[in-house]
């Protein structure tokens, strides 16, 4: 029987690469995005159905979930939509805070709630959420983004206990740097004059060519997504990318405080 994956944030980057990979593997793919009218390629791929979905719109979430479930059982719900809010926390506007939480955290929760009755009734399925290495470690000037990603990791770990009796699995994929247009299309900056020098140092460290060379392509992380979906192990978090694996391994090995000292030296000097 053909399996189906529902993907949020499928217009670019990891979401798009995952949609193409699963379609290639013979899955039915429901690829969602805020502006489906601008998508001219995915809908032509055999097995891919494109739908509109803004994860900050509860009414549209309910409508899209109903339409997707009407097509048949959903084997995998892949919560992938998100963006980064970077810069000084003090400079963040209330609108920026609300938008970040609505998209990265509440959006995931609302989409999952919309699908849970169907998933629970069918008695099988996987809820997979893109977090980030930023959900396991922290870097300077990403505090609100980290709050959402750490929140998703904790939410997923707790939710797994609730849903296991119903045959449902809960997993996260935590990638490091991805060579995509995330930085240009999916990054919003706060501004505050008191932090400009420190922010400049941090951004320079993030942009360092040697550091960026350790990142992954969207296709490589999509492979990790597929592996996580197919894995039967009793495991929640799947760290993806050599840079992310190195960071997380080091944090576990040296402890939180020594790891923080290393991050401070790397990004702030």
Language-model regions, residue ranges each:
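Active-site helix of classical SDR
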Residues: 112, 148
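Active-site loop immediately N-terminal to the catalytic Tyr-X3-Lys motif
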Residues: 90, 137-144
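The beta1-alpha1 cofactor-binding region of Rossmann-like NAD(H)/NADP(H)-dependent oxidoreductases
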Residues: 53-63, 94
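Conserved glycine-rich cofactor-binding loop
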Residues: 11-12
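Residue(s) in the substrate-gating loop at a strand-loop-helix junction
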Residues: 132
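Substrate-binding pocket helix/loop in short-chain dehydrogenase/reductase
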Residues: 88-89, 96-98
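SDR active-site lid
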Residues: 165-235
């Amino acid at each position: 029987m053909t399996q189906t994956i529902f993907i949020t944030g499928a217009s670019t980057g990891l979401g798009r690469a995952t949609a193409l990979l699963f379609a290639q593997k013979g899955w039915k793919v429901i690829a969602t995005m805020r502006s489906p009218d601008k998508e001219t390629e995915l809908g032509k791929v055999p097995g891919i159905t494109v739908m509109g979905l803004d994860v900050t719109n509860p009414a549209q979430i309910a409508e899209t979930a109903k339409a997707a479930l009407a097509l048949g059982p959903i084997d995998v719900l892949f919560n992938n939509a998100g963006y980064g809010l970077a810069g000084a926390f003090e400079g963040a506007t209330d609108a920026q805070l609300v938008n970040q939480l609505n998209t990265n955290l509440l959006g995931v929760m609302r989409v999952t709630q919309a699908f849970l009755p169907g998933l629970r009734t069918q008695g099988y399925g996987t809820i997979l959420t893109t977090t980030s290495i930023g959900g396991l470690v922290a870097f300077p000037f990403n505090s609100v983004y980290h709050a959402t990603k750490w929140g998703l990791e904790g939410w997923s770990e707790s939710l797994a206990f609730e849903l296991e009796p119903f045959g449902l699995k809960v997993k996260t994929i935590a990638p490091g740097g991805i060579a995509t247009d995330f930085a240009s299309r999916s990054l919003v900056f706060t501004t505050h004059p008191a932090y400009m020098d420190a922010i400049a140092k941090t951004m320079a460290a993030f942009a360092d060519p040697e550091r960026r060379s350790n990142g992954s392509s969207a296709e490589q992380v999509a492979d990790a997504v597929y592996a996580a979906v197919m894995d039967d192990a009793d495991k929640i978090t799947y760290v993806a990318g050599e840079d992310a694996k190195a960071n997380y391994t080091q944090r576990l090995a040296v402890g939180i405080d020594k790891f923080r000292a290393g991050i401070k030296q790397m990004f702030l000097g």
